[in-house]
A protein has these predicted regions:
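Conserved S-adenosyl-L-methionine
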Residues: 93-172
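Non-catalytic, mostly N-terminal accessory regions of nucleic-acid modification and defense proteins
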Residues: 1-114
């Protein structure tokens, strides 16, 4: 996926101080959603409510050399980390729970989903699909060529989290 310039990280992190970073981030999210239909309506757009300094500081933190030069699925792992923290901080109300990654990994390793359809009737944040992708990658198989994923979720917030999780991990 090649993003328009105004949606690219380098553009946002180097945005002049006199420009509204909150509005620029909202525009970037809209451009990404237009480019990647799977993310339509899933990305957050409330950036204008945050202090510009906070937004710029966060962009700079993720712009450090260590992150830019990291190998593997670093941003996917970062996303999972914050998703887990979000779930543990009380976002599991209403009977919705994040299945611990260790349990999801165990399930995937037991069923060994190497072809066909992977269906999760309560997919939550999409962890089963992500770990299926990890499993297939470890086997030297391209996930999108080996399996088709289907998920169902009653909570709209979880649906958005799942779509973002899949996108961050390169799964469609």
């Amino acid at each position: 996926i090649f993003l328009p310039e105004k949606a690219q990280y380098s553009y946002l992190v180097n945005l002049p101080e006199d420009q509204d970073i909150g509005k620029a981030l909202v525009e970037a999210m809209e451009l990404i959603e237009a480019q990647v239909p799977m993310l339509s309506g899933a990305l957050p757009k409330e950036y204008t409510r945050f202090e510009p300094k906070l937004l710029r500081d966060l962009l700079r933190i993720f712009n450090r050399d260590a992150l830019q030069n990291a190998n593997g699925d670093v941003f996917g792992r970062i996303y999972e980390y914050f998703l887990n923290k979000f779930a543990m901080s009380g976002a599991q109300e209403g009977g919705e729970f994040l299945t611990p990654p260790s349990l999801v990994r165990l399930i995937v390793n037991v069923i060994e989903p190497d072809h066909g359809i992977v269906f999760d009737p309560a997919c939550g944040s999409g962890g089963m699909f992500v770990w299926t992708g990890y499993f297939l990658n470890e086997q030297g198989t391209e996930p999108s060529k080996a399996v088709t994923i289907y998920g169902q979720e009653k909570a709209e917030t979880n649906t958005r989290l799942s779509r973002m999780n899949l996108a961050v991990h390169g799964l469609e």
